[in-house]
Curated annotation (Swiss-Prot):
Leader sequence segment: 1-19
Keyword hit for Zinc: no
Miscellaneous field: Present with 6500 wall-bound molecules/cell in log phase YPD medium.
Originating species: Saccharomyces cerevisiae (strain ATCC 204508 / S288c)
GO BP annotation list: fungal-type cell wall organization
Protein's recorded name: Cell wall protein ECM33
GO cellular component: endoplasmic reticulum; extracellular region; fungal-type cell wall; mitochondrion; plasma membrane; side of membrane
Family label: Belongs to the SPS2 family.
Glycan attachment residues as annotated in the record: 21, 56, 82, 196, 209, 227, 234, 241, 267, 279, 304, 328, 389
Residue ranges, compositional bias (Low complexity): 361-401
Modification after translation, per record: The GPI-anchor is attached to the protein in the endoplasmic reticulum and serves to target the protein to the cell surface. There, the glucosamine-inositol phospholipid moiety is cleaved off and the GPI-modified mannoprotein is covalently attached via its lipidless GPI glycan remnant to the 1,6-beta-glucan of the outer cell wall layer. Extensively N-glycosylated.
Subcellular location: Cell membrane; Secreted, Cell wall
Matches recorded under PANTHER family: RECEPTOR PROTEIN-TYROSINE KINASE, SPORULATION-SPECIFIC PROTEIN-RELATED
Membrane-related topology note: Lipid-anchor; GPI-anchor
Length: 429
């Protein structure tokens, strides 16, 4: 018998429950002990008479297809992994899994159906290179991780209102997603998915961390607050419109978005950590941050911009580096800001294509020259492939090779000019 001993106990419990109550056709609960493993459909059939199973169920081995019938709740986790012959799986009666739903290393699995599933703690879908269909009726989940799959859609998560972690990475055929999420208490990450990925999070009001890479279009129509860090790195976005956003609690990073020509953050007043705009080659006019008043770390703006409007800026707790290759850019307004004591860090640098001003704020020396006296935070936009942080038990593998594939590291707020340089360097590694 291929099912572990726990299944024998389950069958006995089921028979006993039926004998004790002849009016009940399905026992309310069947215990499989701490855990049990099924390697054949016959093993799963042994618990088909249960509406609830208690314990962790693992499905593995040489199954061509598999199904869990009648079971409505798993008081534990369901893991399906390392089956080279499993092509389809269905459990359309399950409404609730109190633990995790793990699907990993299923190389020919094309479909997984959980049509009634509304509640689960976490879903981890990792290394599913053939899957095209995944369905749920999901309403509540804490963590969602989808990595290294061939899914074209993740609509099975489209009705979720809140999560802790939402991490979608290295899914080369995934080109669009429209979400109903209203809050993300830990992190929202999209990276290394299909070409021209389009995302819409128009109901999202609050998030702790957001990092987007390799995205072509994004909509945040209602986003008001990011409690920690917000990063847009190596995207093909033509524009960024976050006109409802008023506060970023830690760092704000807009780095190496080669097609970005407009950034509108018209209600943003506070950046609690480092503020970085770097290497966005088409961003010639930076006028969407004109209401920013305070920056709690250092500020770094580098590129080919002719206009930079920071007209409301009153305080920068760290250093400041402004470096434009355009000779049309004027440092006058920024030099006035520095002379009024608004820059509180250890240095102030402002350069355009013709002149340079560098001030060490810890001393009284001022240097002006026509040559570049201070190195900028410029770097190439190419980043190495990297695995996303999917979970302690499952690591993603990259399934695509286009520019800068990999999840962004969390950017630590800089408190000095050199801190900003280090933060940009980390982002581009």
């Amino acid at each position: 018998m291929q099912f572990k001993n726990a299944l024998t106990a389950t069958a006995i419990l089921s028979a006993s429950a039926l004998a004790a109550n002849s009016t009940t056709s399905i026992p309310s609960s069947c215990s499989i002990g701490t855990s049990a493993t099924a390697t054949a459909q016959a093993d799963l059939d042994k618990i088909s008479g249960c509406s609830t199973i208690v314990g962790n169920l693992t499905i593995t081995g040489d199954l061509g297809s598999a199904a869990l019938a009648s079971i409505q709740e798993i008081d534990g986790s369901l893991t399906i992994f390392n089956s080279s012959s499993l092509s389809s799986f269905s459990a359309d009666s399950i409404k609730k899994i109190t633990g995790d739903l793990n699907m990993q290393e299923l190389i020919i699995l094309t479909s997984a159906s959980f049509g009634s599933l509304q509640e689960v703690d976490s879903i981890n879908m990792v290394t599913l290179p053939a899957i095209s269909t995944f369905s749920t009726d999901l309403q509540n989940a804490n963590n969602i991780i989808v990595s290294d799959t061939t899914l074209e859609s993740v609509e099975g998560f489209s009705t979720l209102k809140k999560v802790n972690v939402f991490n979608i990475n290295n899914n080369r055929y995934l080109n669009s997603f429209q979400s109903s999420l209203e809050s993300v208490s830990d992190s929202l990450q999209f990276s290394s998915n299909g070409d021209n990925t389009t995302l819409a999070f128009d109901n999202l009001v609050w998030a702790n961390n957001i990092t987007l890479r390799d995205v072509n279009s994004i909509s945040f129509g209602s986003l008001q607050t990011v409690n920690a860090s917000l990063g847009f790195i190596n995207n093909t976005l033509p524009s960024l419109n976050l006109t409802q956003l008023s506060k970023v609690g830690q760092s704000l990073s807009i780095v190496s978005n080669d097609e970005l020509s407009k950034a509108a953050f018209s209600n943003l007043t506070t950046v609690g950590g480092g503020f970085i705009i770097a290497n966005n080659t088409q961003l010639k006019v930076i006028d969407g941050f004109n209401k920013v008043q305070t920056v709690g770390g250092a500020i770094e703006v580098t590129g080919n911009f002719s206009t930079l409007d920071l007209s409301s800026l009153k305080s920068v707790r760290g250093g400041a580096n402004f470096d434009s290759s355009s000779s049309n850019f004027s440092c006058n307004a920024l030099k006035k800001l520095q002379s009024n004591g608004a820059i509180q860090g250890d240095s102030f640098v402002c350069k355009n294509g013709a002149t340079s001003t560098s001030v060490k704020l810890s001393s009284t020396s001022t240097e002006s020259s026509k040559s570049s006296a201070t190195s900028s935070a410029s770097s190439s936009g190419d980043a190495s492939n990297a695995q996303a942080n999917v979970s302690a038990s499952a690591s993603s593998s990259s399934s695509s090779s286009k520019k800068s594939k990999g999840a962004a590291p969390e950017l630590v707020p800089a408190t000095s000019f050199m801190g900003v340089v280090a933060a940009v360097g980390v982002a581009l590694l």
